[in-house]
């Protein structure tokens, strides 16, 4: 039952909202449905609960606030409260302009919303001629601390995003930058290590926000908080210094949950989601921002429920790469409408250091992610470590935080997961999931090319029905006939450090066949490939070469990645230019002309902007479109004039 403390009552009175205190309490206790309140009452609930949160007097959890906010935005999508940074309620001291605006972050609560955001990125990339191969996404933990900006001289609160309060006194109290970092790295958050809070301060403080508020307050801090500052448990963590994952946008689409899980476990601080942002500066500039948030960035948040659960057993599972993942078998527990009986532990070093084994009590969280997650260990026991691969029985070895099966050739789990990965990455077929692959492996199928050699009667002899067997044979043909990119075909082989984005980069400089002759020295000369990656890629390519050649002989319908121009800027008249093709072309398809332009070093966009260099017009192009382009300073050429321009290249 939620009630207001005296300090919360004081905050409530200062806000002078029309909402009654009793109705606020009813809404927070959910004894009255938030949706039954009128818009003004809903807004007051949001204002008050936000004020409590920012004053270290949190009255409802984040997921409840987000649910209220979502309900309000459904019927008031253009309300100013939603279009600006949520107001900060801190003491009555004066505000000063921030060195740089600190906007809020747009939020997503499902994978579908993330996919829509990526669609917007792709559309924007076309508009400014950014190649899909250049669209990299950075993912970082979304810290749940106190937002601030450090310009190297002063520290400021976020305030309303444009003006904040000077809280440099926090550094004067001894607050350090995380990881002994430098001052002046811009936006970040004041946070406290979860492990320190849980073991040292949780008995004295209800939550870490109380401590963060004390650090920025004008008065002297409590002795226990000062100690936390002195030992580096309380820090200012610049976003630039955060652990991060960077990869091609297609990897987000294929492996979203595991990337989120990795970032969720990357820091020893409270987090309430992950932040995704595009790294291409041209794309960032083009997408811009609203008054509330940057369009090139989004936070994936989860409305989570948790429970304390007993561990019954820790079961090892071997992945495609040989890493063995620990899975905690749990006492069946109802959480977020589902009965949970197992959850993945990030890696075996976590099992070892946190004491996860039979009898351990863990805090289990289930949220918008399908996969339940162990948030922390409440009661540690003797850790249960695997000694042998559960699939092939090979003795496991340690590689950093992971236990690994070194049996790369005869481990059933590695073989089956490799086969599944191939068909999943191609993405142009249906039917070859884990169960089908497992059955094929039982009958001795270990290589991808062996699957393509199977006839309908072979599938029937393995126990598949006639219709299923016929469908599988048809799907194998479909996977060869339906056009796919050559970089996606290469990525399907699962070479370490060679996911979709890196595959496309390499194929801009090497053909599929010549790539296998590339040396480590060749790769490190290319932008984005360090020594460690190059070593792993060259070794991985050597390992798959025989299998690759057998599959290549099956004549998959591959779209060839255009090669990066080897000509200098002076050798081609369109090098570096942004070109838009419009109208019906008579000398070839528009697609062919776009590919040719890219091969000559140009960037191709779909619509004219102020950054467009050249508009090439075919038949049936309106005068208004041509005049609008010229008004923007864009050069306009007919199809024939353009072909004459590039005719010697």
Swiss-Prot record:
Gene3D superfamilies to which the protein is assigned, alphabetical: 5' to 3' exonuclease, C-terminal subdomain, BRCT domain, DNA ligase/mRNA capping enzyme, Nucleic acid-binding proteins
Protein EC: 6.5.1.2
Q: Which GO terms describe its biological process?
A: DNA repair; DNA replication
Q: Which UniProt keywords apply?
A: DNA damage, DNA repair, DNA replication, Ligase, Magnesium, Manganese, Metal-binding, NAD, Zinc
Name its co-factor(s).
Mg(2+); Mn(2+)
Q: Which residues form a coiled coil?
A: none
Q: Where is the active site?
A: 142 (n6-amp-lysine intermediate)
Please give the catalytic activity noted in the UniProt record. Answer: NAD(+) + (deoxyribonucleotide)n-3'-hydroxyl + 5'-phospho-(deoxyribonucleotide)m = (deoxyribonucleotide)n+m + AMP + beta-nicotinamide D-nucleotide
**UniProt entry tagged with the keyword RNA-binding:** no
Positions bound to Zn(2+) = 389, 392, 405, 411
- Every copy of the BRCT domain together lies at 569-649
Q: Does the keyword Nucleotide-binding apply?
A: no
Q: Per its UniProt entry, what is the enzyme's top EC class, as one word?
A: ligase
Q: Which Pfam families match?
A: BRCT, DNA_ligase_aden, DNA_ligase_OB, HHH_5
Give the GO molecular function terms.
DNA ligase (NAD+) activity; metal ion binding
Q: Which residues bind NAD(+)?
A: 62-66, 104-105, 158, 189, 301
Task: Please give the family membership noted in the entry.
Answer: Belongs to the NAD-dependent DNA ligase family. LigA subfamily.
Matching HAMAP family = DNA_ligase_A
Q: What is the stated purpose of this protein?
A: DNA ligase that catalyzes the formation of phosphodiester linkages between 5'-phosphoryl and 3'-hydroxyl groups in double-stranded DNA using NAD as a coenzyme and as the energy source for the reaction. It is essential for DNA replication and repair of damaged DNA.
Name it: DNA ligase
């Amino acid at each position: 039952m939620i009630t207001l403390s005296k300090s919360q009552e004081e905050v409530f009175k200062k806000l002078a909202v029309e909402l009654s205190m009793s109705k606020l309490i009813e809404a927070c206790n959910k004894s009255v449905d938030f949706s039954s309140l009128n818009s003004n009452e809903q807004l007051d609930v949001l204002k008050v609960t936000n004020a409590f949160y920012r004053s270290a007097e949190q009255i409802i959890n984040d997921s409840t606030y987000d649910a209220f906010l979502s309900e309000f935005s459904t019927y008031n999508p253009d309300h100013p409260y939603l279009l600006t940074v949520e107001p900060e309620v801190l003491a009555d001291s004066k505000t000063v302009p921030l060195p740089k605006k600190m906007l809020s972050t747009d939020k997503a609560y499902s994978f579908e919303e993330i996919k829509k955001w990526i669609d917007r990125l792709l559309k924007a990339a076309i508009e400014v001629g950014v190649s899909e191969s250049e669209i990299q996404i950075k993912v970082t933990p979304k810290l749940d601390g106190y937002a601030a900006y450090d310009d190297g001289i002063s520290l400021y609160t976020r305030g309303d995003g444009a003006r904040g309060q000077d809280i440099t006194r926090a550094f004067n109290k001894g607050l350090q930058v995380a990881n002994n970092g430098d001052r002046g790295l811009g936006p970040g958050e004041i946070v406290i290590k979860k492990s320190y809070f849980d073991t040292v301060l949780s008995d004295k403080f209800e939550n870490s926000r109380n401590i963060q508020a004390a650090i920025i307050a004008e008065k002297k801090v409590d002795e226990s908080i000062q100690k936390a500052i002195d030992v580096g448990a309380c820090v200012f963590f610049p976003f630039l210094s955060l652990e991060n994952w960077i990869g091609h946008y297609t990897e987000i689409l294929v492996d979203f949950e595991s990337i989120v899980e990795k970032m969720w476990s990357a820091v020893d601080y409270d987090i309430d989601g992950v932040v995704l942002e595009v790294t291409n500066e041209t794309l960032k500039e083009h997408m811009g921002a609203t008054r509330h948030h940057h369009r090139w960035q989004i936070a994936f948040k989860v409305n989570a429920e948790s429970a304390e659960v007993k561990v019954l057993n820790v079961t090892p599972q071997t992945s495609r790469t040989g890493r063995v993942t620990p899975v905690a078998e749990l006492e069946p527990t109802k959480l977020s409408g589902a009965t949970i009986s197992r959850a993945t532990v990030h890696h075996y070093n976590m099992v070892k250091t946190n004491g996860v084994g039979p009898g351990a009590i863990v805090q289990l969280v289930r949220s918008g992610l399908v996969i339940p997650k162990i948030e922390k260990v409440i009661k540690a026991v003797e850790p249960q470590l695997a000694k042998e691969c559960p699939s092939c029985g090979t003795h496991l070895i340690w590689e950093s935080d992971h236990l690994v099966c070194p049996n790369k050739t005869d481990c059933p789990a590695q073989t089956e997961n490799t086969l599944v990965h191939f068909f999943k990455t191609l993405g142009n077929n249906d039917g070859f999931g884990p169960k089908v692959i497992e059955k094929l492996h039982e009958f001795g199928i270990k290589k991808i090319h062996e699957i393509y050699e199977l006839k309908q009667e072979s599938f029937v002899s393995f126990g598949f029905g006639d219709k299923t067997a016929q469908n599988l044979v048809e799907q194998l043909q479909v996977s060869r006939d339906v056009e796919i990119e050559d970089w996606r075909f290469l990525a399907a082989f699962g070479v370490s450090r060679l996911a979709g984005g890196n595959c496309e980069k390499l194929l801009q400089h090497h053909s599929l066949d010549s790539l296998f002759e590339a040396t480590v020295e060749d790769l490190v000369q290319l932008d984005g490939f360090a020594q460690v990656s190059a070593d792993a890629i060259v070794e991985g390519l050597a390992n798959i070469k025989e299998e690759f050649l057998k599959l290549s002989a099956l004549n998959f319908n591959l779209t060839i990645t255009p090669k990066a121009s080897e000509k200098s800027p002076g050798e081609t008249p369109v090098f570096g230019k942004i070109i838009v093709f419009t109208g019906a072309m008579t000398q070839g398809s528009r697609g062919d002309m776009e590919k040719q332009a890219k091969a000559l070093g140009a960037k191709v966009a779909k619509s004219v902007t102020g950054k467009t260099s050249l508009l090439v017009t075919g038949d049936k192009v309106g005068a208004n479109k041509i005049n609008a382009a010229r008004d923007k300073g864009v050069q306009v050429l007919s199809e024939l004039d353009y072909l004459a321009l590039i005719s010697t290249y």
